[in-house]
């Protein structure tokens, strides 16, 4: 995996998934050069989708994308059997890979993680992208566990690394050849400089062209040009997490007239003071017309 993979939002309208809006957003991203899309992850509000909605969104994304870019579907869970069912379904409807978050809340041991991911890897054929995000799961996939999984299972090929500890990233890249994608927009360039391949991005939902240019420059070793784009987008990167993701990105998309719609409880609308900051950043970037 290499390039920019937006973690896409799930647009809602009147309490239901807005599939017309979803198709419009996908076309916009693909037209602006992204390498792939990642539906039904954290940014896609997967915790508040019903199991049927989760599967339907995956199927519709595969249909709408129609082979133009990769579709890496979020199929993780803190239940191995549920993650396995979602992953098998995603494979059956034609995804190019699955994204598996570290089990959250029940906090398995590293041995439990090996068995969890191994059980799924043995049951599907499509590539698996591990997703390490300790800030949400209260659990880190240790570098030795990542190395073990990469070497033991041929279809575990990449990791979305959202642990901001660059020592961990260095240790992983030094120990094995797994593809590392940044799980934090603002750490994209540091991770690529260490040997990473790209980013699973939130900001790319609204600035895909700029993110693709930045990552392409970085992967070509043109870090001076990449840094110019990084610092241009940096204020927006920070604001995307001024409140819980995906509240800021969905708010920004609504401001820009893009299909986004409401959030599902327990997530709710952004505080007015933060909306003003976000609007100013969008204005400064020339995104608001």
From Swiss-Prot:
One of its GO terms (biological process) is diaminopimelate biosynthetic process. Its main location: cytoplasm. The record marks 42, 105 as: Part of a proton relay during catalysis. The active site is at 131 (proton donor/acceptor), 160 (schiff-base intermediate with substrate). Its EC number is 4.3.3.7. SUPFAM superfamilies: Aldolase. It is found in: Cytoplasm. Homotetramer; dimer of dimers. This is 4-hydroxy-tetrahydrodipicolinate synthase. The gene is dapA.
């Amino acid at each position: 995996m290499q390039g920019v993979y937006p973690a896409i939002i799930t647009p809602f309208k009147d309490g239901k998934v807005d599939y017309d809006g979803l198709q419009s957003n996908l076309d916009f991203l693909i037209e602006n050069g992204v390498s792939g899309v990642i539906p039904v992850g954290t940014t896609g509000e997967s915790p508040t989708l019903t199991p049927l909605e989760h599967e339907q969104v995956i199927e519709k994304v595969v249909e709408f994308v129609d082979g133009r870019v990769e579709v890496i579907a979020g199929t993780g869970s803190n239940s191995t059997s549920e993650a396995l069912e979602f992953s098998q379904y995603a494979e059956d409807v034609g995804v190019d890979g699955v994204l598996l978050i570290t089990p959250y809340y029940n906090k398995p041991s590293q041995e439990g993680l090996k068995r969890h991911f191994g059980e799924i890897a043995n049951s599907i054929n499509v590539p698996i992208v591990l997703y390490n995000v300790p800030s949400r799961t209260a659990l880190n996939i240790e570098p030795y566990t990542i190395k073990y999984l990469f070497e033991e299972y041929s279809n575990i090929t990449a990791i979305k690394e959202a642990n901001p500890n660059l020592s961990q990233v260095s240790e992983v890249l030094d120990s094995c050849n797994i593809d590392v994608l940044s799980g934090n927009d603002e750490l994209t360039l540091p991770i690529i400089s260490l040997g990473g391949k790209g980013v699973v991005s939130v900001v790319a939902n609204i600035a895909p062209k700029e993110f693709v240019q930045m990552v392409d420059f970085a992967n070509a070793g043109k870090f001076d040009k990449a840094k110019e784009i990084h610092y241009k987008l940096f204020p927006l990167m920070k604001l995307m997490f001024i409140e819980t993701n995906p509240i800021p990105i969905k708010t920004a998309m609504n401001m820009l007239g893009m299909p986004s719609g409401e959030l599902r409880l327990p997530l709710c609308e952004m505080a007015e003071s933060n909306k003003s900051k976000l609007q100013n950043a969008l204005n400064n970037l020339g995104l608001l017309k």
